[in-house]
Amino acid sequence: MAIHLYKTSTPSTRNRAVDSQVKSNPRNNLIYGQHRCGKGRNARGIITARHRGGGHKRLYRKIDFRRNEKDIYGRIVTIEYDPNRNAYICLIHYGDGEKRYILHPRGAIIGDTIVSGTEVPIKMGNALPLTDMPLGTAIHNIEITLGKGGQLARAAGAVAKLIAKEGKSATLKLPSGEVRLISKNCSATVGQVGNVGVNQKSLGRAGSKCWLGKRPVVRGVVMNPVDHPHGGGEGRAPIGRKKPATPWGYPALGRRSRKRNKYSDNLILRRRSK
């Protein structure tokens, strides 16, 4: 990722960094508008996801997570910014005239060729079933259900590892540290998702975060007691509890939020690491 730093004219631009090698004018037949309503609200209008709201209008890019153009070579034509995810996307021109977007693999450049199928080379950007991959392969965009498309390891810099194959299942170590079983017939893409340093990029000012649809985060200790369990007191006061709590009074640290007796519990060999 080529970082461009601005000349130091104001405090906001002095600390701002952007990528100077990524274009952002998508193809018209691969985008569509979407009505973004709610901004963190549920059907009753109650906030269920805090710190969301505002943001610039977005056009959704149709991403090919299935990679079902089998045994047809494609060439990377552009690397583009996608406002709907922190990973970059790249436009692929296939040999039969088809044009699709895929997630940008780390290290891929314009002019590289990719292909998907059953007996394709183990090369960055190629998609193939887990049964055809050697152990230790770094992968992303992994299917959970055969034919549904990739659902795991799709964020910027995400990478999973194929560590075992036994019977009808393959064992993967996911970016979260979780170790779980997946059907060997499911497909995945070789390599790591690009834009690895996205978490090190400085936005420079509060307005840049507002454009992304992220609202300010206020500490509970500076609120009133009616708004947060940590609120109230004279001056700078402690929270007044043995343990921190959420705005709704539940334990804030260490509480498990996963649903009990979920269908996939039998497939998870090791919980994700905090």
From Swiss-Prot:
Keyword Chloroplast: yes
Record's keyword terms, sorted: Chloroplast, Plastid, Ribonucleoprotein, Ribosomal protein
Keyword Transmembrane: no
Compartments, as annotated in UniProt: Plastid, Chloroplast
Disulfide-bond pairs as recorded: none
Signal peptide region: none
Family: Belongs to the universal ribosomal protein uL2 family.
Binding partners and assembly: Part of the 50S ribosomal subunit.
Name recorded for this polypeptide: Large ribosomal subunit protein uL2cz/uL2cy
Organism: Carica papaya (Papaya)
